[in-house]
């Protein structure tokens, strides 16, 4: 029986030894493995195909490259061809400068005789019969233009295309003044008249066409000194977008014969080129006084300047959108031909301000001042005070200076009182001086 048990155990061992071991997958290594960049959709994409054989796409590409290479070759060849011409052109320019010489004189072309000769003049020399060199552009030559003259032979060697006088360029205001209608105390009727005469024709000319009337050509502002004539002109320049030329009458009086009328012509020429424009002539009585027989050359030159101004105001040439504003203190001394209707259609009078206007002017000038509590603006001006707008401004300035003298940052009523006494004293002295003139 013992043998039977042992034999049964041996059979079990043999059966166990004949069974195969269970498969176990190897451990995955963490090193040397590349991550897949795409998921399962990568296998569905079409591969990139590059034409490496003769096909239509490659042929088109090569033709485009050929076109670019041919264009580059043509550009290089043209550059090589143009080099001698550029060099020759520089040499010709040097020869031209040598022929012209240096320095050059400036003259005025009076008359063209023929294609090769002309008559020129200048304020510092007599008239000359000169030749016109062949390289001068004869299409630019016209009577009255400025030409360049050789300093020895006086031949015409060039034309000044921009023949505007530098003084005219200075007269043109690039920046509009800061004054506006709100800075003017009173003068409601004067502001309304100048708007109707100057502003409205430039901004809405169709209104005058519908009415069947021609807008005024110009206005003259006259009245006592310091009543706001120039201030109103500055406000007009601020309100409108038109070109504004400011001239003082004395600037039209020049030293040499003919310079005054020429400057007057150039002023209106520049105004016409930059239309719409406004020409403001301050102190017009400097050249616009009544004419009389005089043996003085200076007086006759002033009269010629005024005649040129009359021609520009009401000549054969239409001035278009060019308006004229004049200002003077003595309208009675002006020539009647200057201020007649047709040249100056409106005469606007500026009188000394009344009591309410004086208070408005005082309020404008004291609006930015640091006043003390004892200042009463209502009592500073009265009806009896013969004060103009400029006098009130001078009074406010003087009061501020008195406060600064005493190291104070506030202006008191006593400062205004002393300032008013000083201004009134100066006015009395000016009136007394006028009695002996």
From Swiss-Prot:
Can you name the source organism? Saccharomyces cerevisiae (strain ATCC 204508 / S288c)
A Pfam family matched by this chain, by name?
AAA_lid_3
Database matches in PANTHER family: 26S PROTEASOME REGULATORY SUBUNIT
Q: Where is this region: Disordered?
A: 1-47
The similarity comment for this entry is: Belongs to the AAA ATPase family.
GO process terms (BP): nonfunctional rRNA decay; peptide catabolic process; positive regulation of protein catabolic process; proteasome regulatory particle assembly; proteasome-mediated ubiquitin-dependent protein catabolic process; protein-containing complex localization; ubiquitin-dependent protein catabolic process
PROSITE patterns, A to Z? AAA
Single Gene Ontology MF annotation: ATP binding
Keyword annotations of the record: ATP-binding, Cytoplasm, Isopeptide bond, Lipoprotein, Myristate, Nucleotide-binding, Nucleus, Proteasome, Ubl conjugation
Q: Extract the InterPro entries matched here.
A: 26S_Proteasome_ATPase, AAA+_ATPase, AAA_lid_3, ATPase_AAA_core, ATPase_AAA_CS, NA-bd_OB-fold, P-loop_NTPase, Prot_ATP_ID_OB_2nd
- Residues annotated as binding ATP are 223-230
Q: Where is the lipid attached (N-myristoyl glycine)?
A: 2
Q: Where in the cell is it found?
A: Cytoplasm; Nucleus
What is the role of the protein in this entry? The 26S proteasome is involved in the ATP-dependent degradation of ubiquitinated proteins. The regulatory (or ATPase) complex confers ATP dependency and substrate specificity to the 26S complex. Has ATPase activity.
Query: At what sequence positions does the UniProt record place the cross-link Glycyl lysine isopeptide (Lys-Gly) (interchain with G-Cter in ubiquitin)?
Result: 234, 255, 290
GO CC terms: cytoplasm; nucleus; proteasome complex; proteasome regulatory particle, base subcomplex
Instruction: Look up the domain of life of the source.
Output: Eukaryota
Report what the protein is called. Answer: 26S proteasome regulatory subunit 4 homolog
- Name of the gene this protein is made from: RPT2
């Amino acid at each position: 029986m013992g043998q039977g048990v042992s034999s049964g155990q041996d059979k079990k061992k043999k059966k166990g030894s004949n069974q195969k071991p269970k498969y176990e997958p190897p451990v995955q290594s963490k090193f040397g493995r590349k991550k897949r960049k795409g998921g399962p959709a990568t296998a569905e994409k079409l591969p990139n195909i590059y034409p490496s054989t003769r096909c239509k796409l490659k042929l088109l590409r090569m033709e485009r490259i050929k076109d670019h290479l041919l264009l580059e070759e043509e550009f290089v060849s043209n550059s090589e061809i143009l080099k001698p011409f550029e060099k020759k052109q520089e040499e010709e320019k040097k020869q031209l400068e040598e022929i012209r010489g240096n320095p050059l004189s400036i003259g005025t072309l009076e008359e063209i005789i023929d294609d090769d000769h002309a008559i020129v003049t200048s304020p510092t020399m007599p008239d000359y019969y000169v030749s016109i060199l062949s390289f001068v552009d004869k299409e630019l030559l016209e009577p009255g233009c400025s030409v360049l003259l050789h300093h020895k032979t006086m031949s015409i060697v060039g034309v000044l295309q921009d023949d505007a006088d530098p003084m005219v360029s200075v007269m043109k205001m690039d920046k509009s003044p800061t004054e506006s209608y709100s800075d003017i105390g009173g003068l409601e009727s004067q502001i309304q008249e100048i708007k109707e005469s100057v502003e409205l024709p430039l901004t809405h000319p169709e209104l005058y066409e519908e009415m069947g009337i021609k807008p005024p050509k110009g206005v003259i502002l006259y009245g006592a000194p310091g009543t706001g004539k120039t201030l109103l002109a500055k406000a007009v320049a601020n309100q409108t977008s038109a070109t504004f030329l400011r001239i003082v009458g004395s600037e039209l009086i020049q030293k040499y014969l003919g310079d005054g009328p020429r400057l007057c012509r150039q002023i209106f020429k520049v105004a016409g080129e930059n239309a719409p424009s406004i020409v403001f002539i301050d102190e017009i009585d400097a050249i616009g006084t009544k004419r009389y027989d005089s043996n003085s050359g200076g007086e006759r030159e002033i009269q010629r300047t005024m005649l040129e101004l009359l021609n520009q105001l009401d000549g054969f040439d239409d001035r278009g959108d060019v308006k004229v504003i004049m200002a003077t203190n003595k309208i009675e001394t002006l020539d009647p031909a200057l201020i007649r209707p047709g040249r100056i259609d409106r005469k606007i009078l500026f009188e000394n301000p009344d009591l309410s206007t004086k208070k408005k002017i005082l309020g404008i000038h004291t609006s930015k001042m640091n006043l003390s509590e004892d200042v009463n603006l209502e009592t500073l001006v009265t009806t009896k005070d013969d004060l103009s707008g400029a006098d009130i401004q001078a009074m406010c300035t003087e009061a501020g200076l008195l406060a600064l003298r005493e190291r104070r940052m506030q202006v008191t009523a006593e400062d205004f009182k002393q300032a008013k006494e000083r201004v009134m004293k100066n006015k009395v002295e000016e009136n007394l001086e006028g009695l002996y003139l």
